[in-house]
């Protein structure tokens, strides 16, 4: 899709011109490429078309940020869970954080406006998209600062491939 082409255009330009100013474009386009593409798949599957695009974008941005904030609070308060389950604790902590963010942002009678299963899939995918993109961008920045741009690009590619499944 267009977002993947945009990512590789940034990567090509970075290697061709060796300009460090292209790194934020690599991080941003790479972190959002696959989650946004997956989100638009769910948007197209929502045959009722009863959820406006602004609502979805609001959930991507605010839901992604809020779910990361909730997950960080949960990680901080459940350290024993991390010791007991290791890396598996991430899913146990992050998934309720995404659900919590969705429930907070969709509170009240607005939930009654979206009674269909595909509505729930789309709304949940929007929050998950924001979470995945912001988390991937954070990991990419960390690797880029502490290692090399090549390893950062590899990390973005691996997380991009895996992001629709987590």
Predicted regions and their residues:
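Hydrophobic alpha-helical segments at protein termini of multi-pass membrane proteins
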Residues: 1-166
């Amino acid at each position: 899709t267009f977002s993947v082409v945009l990512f590789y255009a940034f990567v090509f330009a970075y290697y061709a011109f060796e300009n460090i100013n292209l790194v934020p474009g690599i991080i941003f386009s790479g972190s959002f490429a696959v989650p946004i593409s997956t989100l638009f798949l769910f948007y197209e599957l929502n045959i009722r078309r009863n959820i406006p695009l602004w609502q979805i974008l609001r959930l991507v941005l605010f839901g992604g940020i809020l779910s990361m904030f909730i997950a960080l609070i949960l990680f901080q308060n459940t350290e024993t869970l991390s010791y007991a389950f290791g890396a598996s604790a991430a899913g146990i902590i992050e998934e309720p954080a995404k659900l919590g963010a969705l429930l907070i942002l969709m509170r009240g009678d607005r939930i009654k406006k979206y009674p269909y299963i595909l509505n729930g899939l789309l709304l949940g995918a929007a929050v998950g998209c924001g979470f995945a993109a912001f988390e991937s961008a954070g990991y990419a920045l960390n690797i880029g600062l502490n290692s090399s741009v090549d390893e950062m690009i590899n990390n973005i590619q691996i997380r991009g491939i895996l992001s629709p499944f987590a």
